[in-house]
Amino acid sequence: MIIARKKLQLQRLWRQRGCRVATYICLGVLVLFGFVYNSKGNSMSSIKSDSAAQQFDDLDDLTNKELPGGPDPNTIFRGSELGNYEPKEPEIPSNQPGEHGKPVPVTDEEGMAAGRAAEKEFGFNTYVSDMISMNRTIPDIRPEECKHWDYPEKLPTVSVVVVFHNEGWTPLLRTVHSVLLRSPPELIEQVVMVDDDSDKPHLKEKLDKYVTRFNGKVIVVRTEQREGLINARSIGAKHSTGEVVLFLDAHCEVNTNWLPPLLAPIKRNRKVMTVPVIDGIDSNSWEYRSVYGSPNAHHSGIFEWGLLYKETQITERETAHRKHNSQPFRSPTHAGGLFAINRLWFKELGYYDEGLQIWGGEQYELSFKIWQCGGGIVFVPCSHVGHVYRSHMPYSFGKFSGKPVISINMMRVVKTWMDDYSKYYLTREPQATNVNPGDISAQLALRDKLQCKSFKWYMENVAYDVLKSYPMLPPNDVWGEARNPATGKCLDRMGGIPGPMGATGCHGYGGNQLIRLNVQGQMAQGEWCLTANGIRIQANHCVKGTVNGFWSYDRKTKQIIHSQKRQCITVSESGSEVTLQTCTEDNERQKFVWKEFYQSS
């Protein structure tokens, strides 16, 4: 009865003209909406097709609340089969020294003298390098699994940017040769060599003539004045036409099948930056070897509060989603020298901050910017690149000589990206408090434009393992030069690690004489802690995860006291040695006056 009554009411309602008109209108709207939605879907499909044509999937890992840089389903492990980009034939060694990355010994006096002269001029032994083939073979020290990965057939093209200033001839050109020798030719758009105002004759007309053999694949761009590594890299990126810009230092050798593993994560998400494993090339013998010992030992990049680069084991959280030890993994930061990044993404990020000079701090500026602005950084175990570590810096900072360039750079990074966490940098580097970072308004505007996240978000979601090794620093109680008026000497770490603390003439430049003593009793110089070892004070690595100690400063007696030993730091009568002795208030060699030292820009 109820159903019949409802049916009769509906029939009466339908007979009313207004109701019928309203129904027809609703049906029409639904049909029109369906047509528009379908057209929009087709339009979106077209956009996706265009994106695919650019070789980027541009997937957003954050749709699943995942950080960018997770496992790539399009990179497939083939088990016992060789991967699709693995070389089919081994490289043929030359009959020159140094093949297979072996060291080249020099024992004659004339050769050793030539090596010393070369090292003084270039920071490494180019005398030995000149004996070695440009196309020498090097050992494949990748993890065994790396030989069995398939990468997408369509990978983005690459512009390799190599910046140099007064570089040695063969190390520079061996870098270029190795890239062209060990890369799929269809992926190398160009090699861009950026000459940062070199004045050595071999880097002028001779170099221009040499690169013509590469038939336009290698170009030389010259700066009009000394720009420094950071700005010169941005210049190189602006001259690049490849979809990805890949930066190498000017003294590298790339290893077997190094390139596809770097490109696959970028293809999946264009906002991911990739970093190869860096192997070592000895600056004297030119031996190629692993830095980490085992090829299966992987580390991610972190930092301590003075913004010194450190490495640590991969976190359990990051390991959990990796089925294979050879898969890429996320890293909070990177060492700065070697990496690949989508060219247009790099441009959106403003390249490097134009206010950063020469070198120093750029790896943090880029790392913080990438992570906080929606991108990610991954280390790639299957991509290996050898790098020569110089014995010393063989050239000056040019017009920036005498300026605290690195401190200025760091302050720009700190003030732009670290928010309230900047206080920990200034606790670690108090002398930089008054350093003027220059105008950072453009960087702050970029951060606002890109809607970048806070540094607190970065520390909690990306760099969460930093605090395990490097906790937030308590305030300094006293810091600066600790001068003993009786001798006129200042406490000095003396440079040895481990090594005893001494006392030397106060020079006013900070360095080994810039001591910090925090409110929890830890005394340190730079990243080194000063601890009691018998009656001596020893400089050594700080115990990771600690910020406390046994030191205190008595402002009344002016003594530096070790509470556990109940002894005071004492300068010897000769004024050079420092020991712990029984505290005596009238002992003038136990009194210290602290003078804070500030850098100026």
UniProtKB/Swiss-Prot annotation:
<feature type="binding site">
    <location>
        <position position="249"/>
    </location>
    <ligand>
        <name>Mn(2+)</name>
    </ligand>
</feature>
<feature type="transmembrane region" description="Helical; Signal-anchor for type II membrane protein">
    <location>
        <begin position="21"/>
        <end position="38"/>
    </location>
</feature>
<dbReference type="GO" id="GO:0046872">
    <property type="term" value="F:metal ion binding"/>
</dbReference>
<feature type="disulfide bond">
    <location>
        <begin position="146"/>
        <end position="382"/>
    </location>
</feature>
<protein>
    <recommendedName>
        <fullName>Probable N-acetylgalactosaminyltransferase 7</fullName>
        <ecNumber>2.4.1.-</ecNumber>
    </recommendedName>
</protein>
<keyword id="KW-0472">Membrane</keyword>
<dbReference type="Pfam" id="PF00535">
    <property type="entry name" value="Glycos_transf_2"/>
</dbReference>
<feature type="binding site">
    <location>
        <position position="387"/>
    </location>
    <ligand>
        <name>Mn(2+)</name>
    </ligand>
</feature>
<feature type="disulfide bond">
    <location>
        <begin position="373"/>
        <end position="452"/>
    </location>
</feature>
<keyword id="KW-0812">Transmembrane</keyword>
<keyword id="KW-0328">Glycosyltransferase</keyword>
<feature type="binding site">
    <location>
        <position position="359"/>
    </location>
    <ligand>
        <name>substrate</name>
    </ligand>
</feature>
<keyword id="KW-0325">Glycoprotein</keyword>
<feature type="binding site">
    <location>
        <position position="196"/>
    </location>
    <ligand>
        <name>substrate</name>
    </ligand>
</feature>
<feature type="topological domain" description="Lumenal">
    <location>
        <begin position="39"/>
        <end position="601"/>
    </location>
</feature>
<feature type="binding site">
    <location>
        <position position="390"/>
    </location>
    <ligand>
        <name>substrate</name>
    </ligand>
</feature>
<feature type="binding site">
    <location>
        <position position="395"/>
    </location>
    <ligand>
        <name>substrate</name>
    </ligand>
</feature>
<dbReference type="GO" id="GO:0000139">
    <property type="term" value="C:Golgi membrane"/>
</dbReference>
<dbReference type="InterPro" id="IPR000772">
    <property type="entry name" value="Ricin_B_lectin"/>
</dbReference>
<dbReference type="InterPro" id="IPR045885">
    <property type="entry name" value="GalNAc-T"/>
</dbReference>
<feature type="region of interest" description="Catalytic subdomain B">
    <location>
        <begin position="328"/>
        <end position="390"/>
    </location>
</feature>
<feature type="domain" description="Ricin B-type lectin">
    <location>
        <begin position="477"/>
        <end position="595"/>
    </location>
</feature>
<keyword id="KW-1015">Disulfide bond</keyword>
<dbReference type="InterPro" id="IPR035992">
    <property type="entry name" value="Ricin_B-like_lectins"/>
</dbReference>
<dbReference type="GO" id="GO:0006493">
    <property type="term" value="P:protein O-linked glycosylation"/>
</dbReference>
<comment type="function">
    <text>Probable glycopeptide transferase involved in O-linked oligosaccharide biosynthesis. Glycopeptide transferases catalyze the transfer of an N-acetyl-D-galactosamine residue to an already glycosylated peptide. In contrast to other members of the family, it does not act as a peptide transferase that transfers GalNAc onto serine or threonine residue on peptides that have been tested. Some peptide transferase activity is however not excluded, considering that its appropriate peptide substrate may remain unidentified.</text>
</comment>
<comment type="pathway">
    <text>Protein modification; protein glycosylation.</text>
</comment>
<feature type="disulfide bond">
    <location>
        <begin position="490"/>
        <end position="506"/>
    </location>
</feature>
<dbReference type="Pfam" id="PF00652">
    <property type="entry name" value="Ricin_B_lectin"/>
</dbReference>
<feature type="binding site">
    <location>
        <position position="251"/>
    </location>
    <ligand>
        <name>Mn(2+)</name>
    </ligand>
</feature>
<dbReference type="InterPro" id="IPR029044">
    <property type="entry name" value="Nucleotide-diphossugar_trans"/>
</dbReference>
<feature type="disulfide bond">
    <location>
        <begin position="568"/>
        <end position="583"/>
    </location>
</feature>
<feature type="region of interest" description="Catalytic subdomain A">
    <location>
        <begin position="155"/>
        <end position="265"/>
    </location>
</feature>
<feature type="disulfide bond">
    <location>
        <begin position="529"/>
        <end position="542"/>
    </location>
</feature>
<comment type="similarity">
    <text>Belongs to the glycosyltransferase 2 family. GalNAc-T subfamily.</text>
</comment>
<keyword id="KW-0464">Manganese</keyword>
<feature type="glycosylation site" description="N-linked (GlcNAc...) asparagine">
    <location>
        <position position="135"/>
    </location>
</feature>
<dbReference type="InterPro" id="IPR001173">
    <property type="entry name" value="Glyco_trans_2-like"/>
</dbReference>
<keyword id="KW-0333">Golgi apparatus</keyword>
<keyword id="KW-0808">Transferase</keyword>
<dbReference type="GO" id="GO:0004653">
    <property type="term" value="F:polypeptide N-acetylgalactosaminyltransferase activity"/>
</dbReference>
<feature type="region of interest" description="Disordered">
    <location>
        <begin position="61"/>
        <end position="108"/>
    </location>
</feature>
